[in-house]
Amino acid sequence: MTFVLDRSTQRTRRGDVVIGGSPLRLFRLAPAGTAQFDRLAAGDTVGASKLVERLVDAGAIHPVPDAGAGPRQTGTLTAADVTIVVPAWSNNPDLDPGAWNAWLGTLPGGAPVAGVVVVDDGSRPPLALPPGVRLVRRARNGGPAAARNDGVAEVTTALVAFVDTDVTVTDGWLDGLLGHFADDRVAAVAPRVASARGPGAVARYEAAHSPLDLGPEPARVAPGTRVGYVPGAALVARTDAVRAVGGFDPALRTGEDVDLVWRLIAAGHRVRYEPGVVVHHAPRPTWSGLVRQRIAYGSSAALLARRHPGTLAPVRMSGWTALAWALLLAGRLRLAALVVAATTAALVPKLGGVPAATSVRLALTGHAGAGRQLADAARRAWWPLVAVAALVSRRARRLAALAALPALTDGGLHRLLDDAAYGVGVWRGILTTGELGPLWPQLRDWPRRQR
């Protein structure tokens, strides 16, 4: 299998130190590892090794799926090993069965899949599907988790592909994902879910800011990393792995897909994000619909934090970086500058073998990235606290204005509305459950060293 370097991955001039991944990690290479990394960086085919495994798990390199042997090769899976499961619900009595038939016909993307299972999740009136469609009817609506679980119960193939009814797939979409399953540790792979383009301001905004669109860069998926989750709107998974972790949790009406992905990862599996395959998700038709969606997404944060402690932290940074920003926000500029200078200087010997200029750049980049996280948190999970502080403090008002600037320059007032709606959902979940996890920052060392 061949690999590409993550955008964060860089190598020192001597060639025996690699820094990369999410969060950043430092790898010291022996001579054999240096030679192997040369081949990785050149795009040559590389077999399984401990170095490859560590770099993949760190998110420092990403596999390029092909028909060749990958790490831990178990055989090639094809579209014939895939059953597509569609959770469906509608309260529209005029829904056209012909339109259903046309949409269902696109799901295989031109590939000969084993079958398609539609789960009618208590629609009123019941969905009228074309003859020949494999249909499971639920007596009452149980939500997408319950519907997907009923679909999985019908699956006899090695892989199951979940596709929501508001998703449009492209030809060959399965072929672009199946190669990842050459690695037997991979339990699930998700494509990029871009927002479908359309007329109107909402569609234009969603095209650039959909929470389902995780960007153009490949990633290993893990909580607290650059790509911390993937949506279940389009997801291909090993059927046995899904069953082994208990399937989707029907108690979650939103966030059930994130919960499943994190349980797969906790069970020792890998989950991959493959943006080389793009499907399209229908945007909300109105601003009120978008706000309701974002509130629903935020509402799942508290329950997810209770199930997966530490995963929903609004900011992640080192303790020294947190101190520097706390001093800066308190107006103690000289002390903040002193902490930044001291921690930057201390990082140079810690990263022995890394050029001083590189160490300084990493330290300053880390401090700046923490500032962006703080601004995001101030607009999202923390905004009610910021708003209260702004009522009584001129400094808080200035800081709130600074936190709003990144959003205003990338989406304008609509972005502020988006962030605030998510924050409303977070607080709704907190008040309902009493779980404060989505508010607490997480402090950690950076970068970690790997040998």
List each language-model region with its residue ranges:
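Acidic donor-binding segment of Leloir-type glycosyltransferases
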Residues: 101-139
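Short aromatic/hydrophobic "clamp" motif used to bind/position activated sugar donors
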Residues: 160
